[in-house]
């Protein structure tokens, strides 16, 4: 990529339940400006930005008087759409990445194929329904929405862990790190689409 990144995108999405605006720069430095009204979720999105080096601005207003579900899911949808738009043809990307990430008592693996084909494999179990006031089931809901709309195949496997906060946070950090690697420009094929099909449109 040139010094001035062209892999940027902004998406605004409004429904009767939420109003969300997202901007991303895939060639950023991990700067973030995130306000969703859900404190724990903000913290997780900050980890996603910081460790992927994707600059993110996420402004979300949702029906939090009901619960956090619509805000979390719709943020995943909008963020995924922004990433897909910024990727364009997905020309020159590394495409694949995987790793195991340690966080204190917890070990979580993530693998990604930025293929244009949307899929989530989720092997993560929480031992409590909530982290503070945040429903732990919403972690999966976010990644499901994000993967489907970014057009990526994403596998997340928690191998072990005792602390539910660490389990949740390790999923965001592991996904961040594989996104960082897979979205990098491959210096050996800067202008090529990394597929024998000649397309990564699904």
Curated annotation (Swiss-Prot):
Any Gene Ontology CC annotation: cytoplasm
Residues annotated as signal peptide: none
Keyword tRNA processing part of the UniProt annotation: no
MF terms in GO: imidazoleglycerol-phosphate dehydratase activity
Keyword set includes ATP-binding: no
GO biological process, one term: L-histidine biosynthetic process
Gene3D superfamilies reported for this sequence: Imidazole glycerol phosphate dehydratase, domain 1 (3.30.230.40)
Location(s), subcellular: Cytoplasm
Domain of life where this protein originates: Bacteria
One Pfam family, short name: IGPD
Catalysis performed (reactions): D-erythro-1-(imidazol-4-yl)glycerol 3-phosphate = 3-(imidazol-4-yl)-2-oxopropyl phosphate + H2O
Keyword annotations from UniProtKB, A to Z: Amino-acid biosynthesis, Cytoplasm, Histidine biosynthesis, Lyase
Record-listed E.C. numbers: 4.2.1.19
SUPFAM superfamilies: Ribosomal protein S5 domain 2-like
Chief site of localization: cytoplasm
Biological pathway: Amino-acid biosynthesis; L-histidine biosynthesis; L-histidine from 5-phospho-alpha-D-ribose 1-diphosphate: step 6/9
Family (UniProt): Belongs to the imidazoleglycerol-phosphate dehydratase family.
Stored PANTHER family: IMIDAZOLEGLYCEROL-PHOSPHATE DEHYDRATASE, IMIDAZOLEGLYCEROL-PHOSPHATE DEHYDRATASE HIS7
Protein name in the entry: Imidazoleglycerol-phosphate dehydratase
Protein species of origin: Brucella suis (strain ATCC 23445 / NCTC 10510)
């Amino acid at each position: 990529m040139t010094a001035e990144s062209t892999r940027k995108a902004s998406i605004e999405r409004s429904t009767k339940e939420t109003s969300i605006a997202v901007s991303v720069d895939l060639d950023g430095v991990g700067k973030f400006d995130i306000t969703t009204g859900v404190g724990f979720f903000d913290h997780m999105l900050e980890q996603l930005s910081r460790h992927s080096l994707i600059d993110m601005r996420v402004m979300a207003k949702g029906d939090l008087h009901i619960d956090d579900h619509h805000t979390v899911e719709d943020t995943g949808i909008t963020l995924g759409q922004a990433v897909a738009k910024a990727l364009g043809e997905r020309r020159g990307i590394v495409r694949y990445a995987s790793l195991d990430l340690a966080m204190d008592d917890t070990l979580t693996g993530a693998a990604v194929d930025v293929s244009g084909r949307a899929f989530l494999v989720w092997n993560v179990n929480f031992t409590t329904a909530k982290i503070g006031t945040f429903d732990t089931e919403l972690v999966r809901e976010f990644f499901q929405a994000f993967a489907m709309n970014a057009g990526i195949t994403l596998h997340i496997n928690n191998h072990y862990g005792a602390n539910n906060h660490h389990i949740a946070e390790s999923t965001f950090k592991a996904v961040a790190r594989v996104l960082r690697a897979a979205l990098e420009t491959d210096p050996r094929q800067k202008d090529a689409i990394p597929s024998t099909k000649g397309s990564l449109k699904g």
